[in-house]
Amino acid sequence: MSMNTVPERLAALRAAMKANGVDVYLIPVGDPHSSEYLPDHYTSLTYFSGFHGENSNFVVTPTESAVWADGRYFVQAEKEIAGTEIQLMRMGEPGVPTVEEYCGKVLPENGVLGLCGLTASCGLVRGVQKELDAKKGTIKTLNLEDELWTEGRPARPATPAWILPKEYAGFSPAEKLERLRGKLKELGCTAQLVGKLDNLAWLLNLRAMDIQCTPYAMSYCYVTPERAVLFINTARLGAEAAAELKANGVEIQEYDDVLKFLAAETEPQTVLADPASVNFAVYETLQNNAALTVKDEADPLLPMKGVKNEVELAHDREAHLRDAVAMVRFQKELEERLAAGEELTELTVDEILHKYRSAQDKFIVESFGTIAAYGGNAAMMHYHATEEDHAKLERKGFLLVDSGATYLDGTTDITRTYPLGELTEDEKLFYTWTLQCHIDIAKAVWLNYCAGHMLDTIAREPLWRHLINYRCGTGHSVSFVGNVHEGPHALNGRNTTVFQPGMIITDEPGVYEAGQVGIRIENELECYHKADNQYGTFLAFRPLTFVPIATSPVVPGVLTRDELDWLNAYHREVFEKLAPRLNEEERDWLAKKCAAIGA
């Protein structure tokens, strides 16, 4: 059977379902480590549905199929599944079922739902089973993705692994392991199977390039009071990395032996397992071992790495300044080439940015694929230009550029929206209101009990006044030399993590009008202790990102005096920090971009 198109792949999947006695098949966006960004080998949802989004699930029955997308991907998903039978489920919209509810609805009485236990989290499987119980439905673990996707499938990654030096990380693997063991003891546990790659990277200072733009290594680590066992493809570990791990008390075993090891473990342990991040196959193996008692708890590594230590913060600040130099040189060249009448495209933007970023000291890789989106393309929050589908830059409207890099000493994420020429009055207002949102959260001061969902409203209020909203969070945490998205804190309507000094967050409100315009302004911010007094402890943000923000689109009279003062003070600081790193011509250009407005 041909497997070149989505309809052909769905037909093959349905035939395999029938042969295996499966009524409904669920494919999550996932790998064995609950990663947000996936190694190409695990992009099964895209292979079978055609949709390239994150945070998604795909469900197939004998007669219908549906894919879930969150607000960042509504426009993109519509475009990518157009012309197929697949229904789009817009997550969070009124009347739209969750994937768990949908599975319960479409499963026949006494039916069987199939899924791969390695790529589905325990939490997802539990949620689905709860919905199936009313119909006496059961879950069958099998791997139809591996059975069917054989031709042209990328191999499972095994890039060279290395250890981030303590001079950048701040603490050694041995020191972090002791801290984890202490936390496990507080939680009444003696062991943990660490499966999330970002948590494991932080714990062991382990890095590789198994995921595009994300310096992580496919691996697990089993931690007890006496042992730390790393499961990794040993061929990828050089002698230096292996010796460093062993010197820090880490044993090394083969990646594929993890389930066999857990099943054979005879030392009694109370094992912490986070259902949200441990895959179902691992969780089931732990549960089936009589020597192990499984305790469901949130992964304690998440808050540990979410608060950056002073060494990490110092390096991150420096990485952001080098990144800012690249951004300044990029914008200057872009403007000069446009002014000279050169025909440029969204792809050109990516090329210019890469040229300047990759020239910076300690550059490793872009922290995600650059989003260079002109005009209406920017309404798709995670749009990516391709050779087959990209826009030319015209001398009007906005160009949105969301980009970042990972360096040996930090990870960056920045968005700027550039005016390329004539703007409509609506475009100017949308830009000005977005800038108000950005400034209001950047200059916020709050008592130290405030969580992300509370601060999120500060950012949205300027848009809410005009009955406008954006269907995504205002900000996310950023790893240190790692994933551009991490937890536990975030700025959105759901996050309950209380902010602490040392946390890093993005500030990226926006306006998105489908097919017309997309505007976003993003800096990274560092949470710090501002003051103590009789009323309590106050916290605030200060910028990590120092790159000029376009002021020509700002509508006079809209920004308050406080907002103008913040913007002008920010631009003074941008110039002071970057000028010594630039040549005379670049400094003159930057001075104009940082000129005060509204005085």
Name each region found by the language model.
Residues 1-599:
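Active-site neighborhoods and metal-handling regions in enzymes and metal-associated proteins
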